[in-house]
């Protein structure tokens, strides 16, 4: 009897033990399965993050290994004007595209060619020349180095050269708006304009500005001067002071570094100055009425991006009021609100083609007569 009871007890114990083992094995398998699934998910998540990180790095460094350099004109990289704007655009390209960026300053015209050659010798992928004054040097270097890509601001004389991209601007359009503001702002019916050089390119500023002044104020007189330099602040200041003596109470400087002297003279005389190329209000906030902006920074960034994308094809690229390649500075606190509204309407007319702004001698004189002297 005891044997039968013990046998039954033993059988029951073995059954319970087997059941427990079965449950333990099942739980172990389920635990292992869950762990594997979790590991797979974690692995997938890590892979996705790695891919995203890889893509981000790819986007940020798509220009890695590419070198872009700018050669300034004699105004230098701190001219507060288009050389500085060009460098700011290239710095943006360095940050956003991952390119290597560098500038070389030209102290005299004789520096243009050797500066370009320095970048060629250092195997730069794109060399950007800032200003029409570099055109002759670029012509020689682009011919001698057909495999190197070049760009130049404010010159289209090399438009047919396949490895040169010309970056042009409708500066007469924005100069017209600046002139209109000047004509509406002057209290003495006398305003001025100071050019760094009286070339065809620079005279486009003069035609637009003078046209804007006269359309705003038919009684206004426009004093005009050629400083004959983009890097002589003393001459800029003397020239502006002469205009102040002759009654000017608004002066538009289109003279690079020389123009800083113009602004200084206006500040001392407590009259208005109009800046050029970039927003120059930070130089003298209570003196700068507005600035005729030319977005050289955007042009330099754009051609750098085209290099990275493999789309630099040469030819001419022109920036206008329609694509905000030129415009007045955004700050309007020094301009009469009524004039701001009038300027906004003028912008629409220029963009639509209803208002044609003269950018050459023939078109200017056809409407306004022979009142612009710097083209003689």
Regions found by a protein language model. Name each.
Residues 23-376:
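A residue-level marker of the well-folded mature domains of exported/periplasmic proteins
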Residues 12-13:
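Repetitive helical segments and hydrophobic/amphipathic motifs
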Residues 4, 22-23:
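N-terminal helix-turn-helix DNA-binding module of bacterial transcription factors
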Residues 1-9:
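Positively charged n-region of N-terminal signal peptides that target proteins for export
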Residues 17-20:
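C-terminal motif of bacterial Sec signal peptides marking the signal peptidase cleavage site
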